[in-house]
């Protein structure tokens, strides 16, 4: 095993072979977590340098394949806690429990290597520490791999009679199929919620791209884990600042970890279209936007905590800022969040508004929204189907904004406090546009839109206000269209209609 070295000069051949043999069935390793952890440490200590990495990547693909197999082997969802997504206590303890032949001197030495790197000696190695080291080992191998063209490198190496570097093909990163492997890998984030874990998934995305993207964006936990891991890192930095001796973390290592998370954000921004990013963010919009706000406020403090700022660190800070903004501004835009700089970080709001203006003029969008409101001549309380025609009269407008009509006081009250499109959130902005511009008299004028835009610009009306108005009107129609479709579905299904009527009578 030419050139491969180990910590404490253990037999490198046996370290690799026993590690791989133990994971022949990664669902049931032959050894405990301490033994597996010790093997990894014996081959990957920092003092062993990059030479070991290169030798392992060229000569011992089976070593990396075993590491990947342990992280990606499908496990029953019942093995995991539904709240934390960590392994269930009994599963975790069974995994960590030592069944090794401790009479074997080599096994004793491997256990000693593991103990030497952990604060508490002589106890089982936690699954979280084994997971962390697995992610480190794989990430170190994928860092150069993500910048290489794996297919071209394999062809060139074969033609030159050289050994191919691991991974030789993207499929080696999802040995149990893309869906099953990625779902299993993501569950490890509940066991090892670390920046290196997200960084590794980012590297996999850089290499495998669309082959695994659907299962990354389709995860029901990954968006929240992204926000959680960012917050864990910030809290660790705060602890380091207050009690430096309490943690191994330094401002420099914190910056490196934040860069790893930013790389994952970078891959999402580069690879996801609007539909995919909306699927990813899904139920985590608030968490992701809060994450962005937190990081953008934290970065100047993190920068100050670095003793001397190198050119590389300056670049890293800008990279982190760029891709947290890029991800969060897209989430803000795609989910039609208000352009409110008191609620969201100003940089997120401004970049989101910039994306909107690339699609069209927010002022003209607002005018078109006003025109659509006027055309429909109906009550704008979601859930109400009354129109001017059905009621035989025009409806009174909201007295505050003098724009939105309602058929009755109860409808207006309900609309004011609606859970998704509350009129109270936009009324003041609507009123300011009506008061300062030629509305509503110019709505039917073919040149009314241009007159409206010119007036807004002349009076210095903020485009963000117009954008908020346009988006709110869009949301109103979306809400009302959803309700209309539901009612039409009920009317087309007699059984459901009867059930609905029966429920109404009971009430």
Describe the residue ranges of each PLM region:
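Generic structural signal for coil/turn-prone sequence and helix-edge features
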Residues: 1-386, 433-507
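Glycine-rich, flexible loop segments associated with nucleotide phosphate handling
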Residues: 253-258, 392-400
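Flanking scaffold residues of small Cys/His-coordinated metal-binding clusters
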Residues: 374-379, 393, 402, 422
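Cys/His-coordinated zinc-finger cores
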Residues: 388, 397-426
